[in-house]
UniProtKB/Swiss-Prot annotation:
<keyword id="KW-0051">Antiviral defense</keyword>
<dbReference type="GO" id="GO:0000166">
    <property type="term" value="F:nucleotide binding"/>
</dbReference>
<keyword id="KW-1133">Transmembrane helix</keyword>
<dbReference type="InterPro" id="IPR043760">
    <property type="entry name" value="PycTM"/>
</dbReference>
<feature type="transmembrane region" description="Helical">
    <location>
        <begin position="181"/>
        <end position="201"/>
    </location>
</feature>
<protein>
    <recommendedName>
        <fullName>Pycsar effector protein PtPycTM</fullName>
    </recommendedName>
</protein>
<keyword id="KW-0812">Transmembrane</keyword>
<keyword id="KW-0547">Nucleotide-binding</keyword>
<feature type="transmembrane region" description="Helical">
    <location>
        <begin position="60"/>
        <end position="80"/>
    </location>
</feature>
<keyword id="KW-0472">Membrane</keyword>
<feature type="transmembrane region" description="Helical">
    <location>
        <begin position="85"/>
        <end position="105"/>
    </location>
</feature>
<comment type="function">
    <text>Pycsar (pyrimidine cyclase system for antiphage resistance) provides immunity against bacteriophage. The pyrimidine cyclase (PycC) synthesizes cyclic nucleotides in response to infection; these serve as specific second messenger signals. The signals activate the adjacent effector, leading to bacterial cell death and abortive phage infection. A clade D Pycsar system.</text>
</comment>
<keyword id="KW-1003">Cell membrane</keyword>
<comment type="function">
    <text>The effector gene of a two-gene Pycsar system. Expression of this and adjacent uridylate cyclase PtPycC (AC A0A4V2JTK3) probably confers resistance to bacteriophage. The genes are probably only expressed in response to bacteriophage infection. Probably only responds to cUMP (produced by its cognate NTP cyclase), acts by impairing membrane integrity.</text>
</comment>
<dbReference type="GO" id="GO:0005886">
    <property type="term" value="C:plasma membrane"/>
</dbReference>
<dbReference type="Pfam" id="PF18967">
    <property type="entry name" value="PycTM"/>
</dbReference>
<dbReference type="GO" id="GO:0051607">
    <property type="term" value="P:defense response to virus"/>
</dbReference>
Length: 202
């Protein structure tokens, strides 16, 4: 039982409580980018972006599954003219769990707009920072981006920061997907119990 509870705890809470070091700090401390090329940094960013896409696809599948469960619940409920108190309770539990699963999946799909408030921490490769710091200042953004691109050290540092941010986004999306799946499975159990109750005349 303790093993099961531990697994459910890890599934629900994930590892968001563990602080991750900023990779741009490690790049700055190294003082040289001879080992890591700019192409390698872009490749790592592309890989992390694929993780984000996969997590969003997973959330989309979960939402579709939740929609099917909601349709099933409506169909079963519509076929019961005079439900008993037991059936009503099961229907209510199933509805709450299905709705909660949909909300959890939707939270995972919400985009992240917040950027760095400090100018020194601004990343010209992140759309949130671009929108916050360069709204209506296209020429200033061109200058800032050119300054980053013109320095391999600065470019790799900014790419590393974006990799770090995107990895955090991906892990959070997977966490919300896991939570939605867990709650959705409980809703599915309620649907099976409801169907059995209707068949047995509860």
């Amino acid at each position: 039982m303790s093993t099961l509870l531990g697994w459910l705890g890890r599934l629900w809470f994930g590892s968001l409580g563990t602080a991750r070091p900023d990779p741009s700090t490690a790049v700055a401390a190294a003082g040289s980018t001879d080992v890591t090329s700019t192409q390698d940094a872009w490749a790592v960013l592309s890989l992390v972006n694929e993780w984000v896409k996969h997590s969003e696809a997973k959330l989309g599948v979960v939402l579709a599954f939740v929609g099917v469960m909601a349709a099933g619940l409506i169909t079963i409920a519509a076929d019961i003219p005079c439900p008993s108190l037991v059936i009503l309770c099961i229907e209510g539990a199933a509805a709450v769990l299905i709705l909660a699963s949909a909300v959890l999946a939707s939270l995972g799909l919400l985009p992240r707009f917040k950027g760095q408030s400090e100018e020194a921490q601004m990343n010209p490769l992140f759309y949130g920072d671009v929108a916050n710091h360069f709204k209506g200042k296209s020429e200033e953004y061109v200058t800032a981006l050119s300054g980053v691109i013109g320095s391999q050290d600065a470019l790799i540092r900014q790419i590393a920061r974006q990799v770090h941010a995107n990895a955090d986004v991906a892990s959070r999306k997977y966490l919300w997907a896991n939570r939605s799946i867990l709650v959705g499975m409980l809703g599915l159990v309620c649907l099976f119990v409801l169907a059995a109750g209707v068949a047995l005349g509860w």
